[in-house]
Structure formats: structure tokens, C-alpha cells
Design a protein with these regions (language model features):
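Sequence/fold signature of self-assembling virion shell proteins
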Residues: 2-9, 148-185, 196-199, 205-308
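Structured alpha-helical segments in the cores of large, soluble enzyme domains
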Residues: 74-84, 175-189
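Alpha-helical scaffold segments that mediate packing/assembly in large oligomeric complexes
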Residues: 97, 102-109, 116-179
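Glycine-rich, often proline-containing surface loops adjacent to acidic residues and nearby aromatics
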Residues: 85-100, 157, 194-199
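N-terminal alpha-helical "arm" segments
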Residues: 1-28
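Short, well-structured alpha-helical interface segments that form or flank functional binding sites
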Residues: 87, 102-109, 113-116, 195, ...
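Surface-exposed acidic, glycine-flexible loop patches that form ligand/cofactor-binding
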Residues: 135, 186-193
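Assembly/oligomerization interface modules of large self-assembling protein complexes
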Residues: 26-88
Length: 308
């Protein structure tokens, strides 16, 4: 349906515009900054889908007696994860008259608003692996992204979720740090080096709690004069994501992006096409489209809990 003058009369009534309209259209309300790029691996793609394959490394070496043959092992394929790109787009059509009478240049900025709509969608989609990480968002082992029993291809299990979900506190965060040291394993069950730099991703409701926990020099919320080991033993970056839907859930993501598998593949970037004109009506048409995929090809380097 084309934009006509009657559907937005305030733009064409030849009187001073309401200040609320001015605030929206003239940029006094600012767009939310991008959040997902702070912790996602953002990569470009030139294929219709991307496939990530993990592998099972060698087991431990075996005792070998003098003159005896060596024990041999093989590298094996682990799990496979496909990222299938989806296309999103939006169009805007305006009549010739509405375009001509656009005294405030609102209609001519339609391309900017279309790009904003695309960015807003991407930000929301990028929050889904965390929002759905305890249910429908799965890793290649078929289990939820945050789970207490991830299946290792070489045998055994590992977890990246508290055994009993807990609200964010100094004690629950300390337990998460312990769990990441005992359960960050490769597919053969080998323990990985402890991750010492973390991004703590939280909803706005936990911002002040998180700041007290990770930035207090002394133990927060106690009368003890002990130092705060959460601050002294780890490096933290608190990231507030307003697109998280659970006000109690909190997440840990490795500060070094190469140590986790949260990935955003960009097949076609946000593209606003040049303004077109309908030859029959002379209506102006503007469209935008983008193709991308989002997910986690491994649970390693992440940790999450739903809260109590």
C-alpha cells in the first residue's frame, strides 16, 4: 500500500509540527547502539549456507614397553553445524503527490528508516541464542546451548550451566568460574586452559548488581574485609543487552571471540536500493534487504543460567 498524504496529515497541514514528531524525525531520540557485535563473531559468507565441522583430537598417549609396538589413534569427525541464511526485507511506497509535498523531508529519509528497521531485526535475532539457550537453541550435540550434560563425541559429558540455576550473586558467579575450569573440555574430554577474560551479558535489571559484583575491590554485600577474588582473578566486561527477555538470566561469554562459537554470518549486508519509480503511477518505491544466519556451533566458551 502506498503512503498517501492523508495517512500522515501532520506532514502536510502547513502548521507548526508537534514537538514529539520533531523529536522522532530530527534525531533527538537516538538509536540503540549495536550490542551483539560486542560478543558475536561476525563473519561474511559467500555461500548459500555455512557448515562448521568439529573434530575429536587424539586421546592420551599410552604406556609403551621396550620393543613393543606403538598404540595408534586417529583424528575423528565430531559434530556438524549448518548455518542456513534467511532473507529479510521491507519496502516503502509513496505517491507522487505525497513525495512532492514532503516539506519536512521526512519521506525522503525513508531509506534511513528502512535501514534502522533492518538493524533492529538483526539485534533481536542475535539475542535469540541467549533468550532460547535453555530450550530451542541447540548446539550440534542436539542439546540446548546451556546444558548440564553436553555430550562429548569422544565419550563423557560436560556442562556450561549451573547444576541448580541461581540468581546473579558473588557466590553463583564464583561457582560458574569453578565450573568453567572443570568442564571446559574438547570433544576428547581434555580440559582446556581456563578462560580468564569474560563478558558478562545481562538484562538491564541486573546492571547494578553486576557492577557491584565484578568491580568491588572487597567482597560485595558483606562486612568482611576480604578482597573480591572475582575482580582480582578475572577480567570482566559487563554488557547490558535490552533485548534479553528474562530479567533473571545471565550469561558468560569468553572475552576472546576465538574461544567461543557464537557466530553471525552476513551473506548480504543491509542494502537500501536506489529509489525506483512505478511507470504507471509515478509512485516512489524504496526497498531494503539483507541475508544472514545466527547461531552457536559449540557450547564451549559460554555459560548461562536462567536465575532462580
Amino acid at each position: 500500500m502506498a503512503q498517501v498524504r492523508g495517512s500522515f496529515e501532520a506532514l502536510y497541514d502547513n502548521v507548526d509540527k508537534d514537538m514529539a514528531l520533531q523529536a522522532i524525525m530530527r534525531g533527538q531520540l537516538k538509536e540503540l547502539p549495536r550490542v551483539y557485535t560486542k560478543y558475536f563473531n561476525v563473519r561474511t559468507s559467500d555461500r548459500k549456507f555455512e557448515r562448521v565441522v568439529t573434530y575429536v583430537p587424539f586421546s592420551e598417549t599410552a604406556t609403551k614397553g621396550e620393543g613393543e609396538t606403538y598404540t595408534f589413534d586417529t583424528l575423528r569427525q565430531g559434530y556438524t553445524k549448518d548455518f542456513t541464511h534467511t532473507t529479510a526485507g521491507l519496502g516503502f511506497e509513496v505517491t507522487q503527490e505525497a513525495f512532492e509535498d514532503d516539506a519536512e523531508n521526512v519521506i525522503t529519509q525513508a531509506g534511513t528508516w528502512l535501514a534502522f528497521a533492518a538493524r533492529y531485526l538483526e539485534e533481536g535475532r542475535a539475542a535469540n541464542p541467549l533468550n532460547n539457550g535453555f530450550g530451542t537453541e541447540t548446539t550440534p550435540d542436539g542439546l540446548s546451548l546451556f546444558n548440564t550434560a553436553h555430550i562429548l563425541k569422544g565419550g563423557g559429558t560436560a556442562k556450561n550451566r549451573l547444576s541448580t540455576d541461581a540468581d546473579l550473586s558473588a557466590s553463583s558467579l564464583a561457582q560458574a568460574m569453578i565450573d568453567t575450569q572443570t568442564d571446559q573440555k574438547d570433544e576428547a574430554g581434555h580440559l582446556a586452559a581456563p578462560i580468564t577474560s569474560w563478558k558478562l551479558v545481562i538484562p538491564p535489571a541486573l546492571e547494578f548488581t553486576a557492577d557491584r559484583i565484578v568491580n568491588s575491590v572487597l567482597l560485595p554485600g558483606t562486612a568482611d574485609n576480604d578482597r573480591n577474588p572475582i575482580k582480582s582473578l578475572r577480567t570482566w566486561d559487563v554488557i547490558v543487552n535490552p533485548r534479553l527477555t528474562d530479567t533473571d538470566a545471565w550469561f558468560l561469554i569468553a572475552g576472546n571471540k576465538s574461544q567461543h562459537g557464537l557466530t553471525f554470518y552476513r551473506r548480504i549486508p543491509i542494502t537500501v536500493e536506489p529509489m525506483d519509480k512505478d511507470p504507471k503511477t509515478k509512485n516512489r518505491i524504496i526497498t531494503t534487504r539483507h541475508r544472514f544466519s545466527i547461531g552457536a556451533w559449540t557450547w564451549i566458551g559460554t555459560f548461562g543460567t536462567q536465575g532462580a
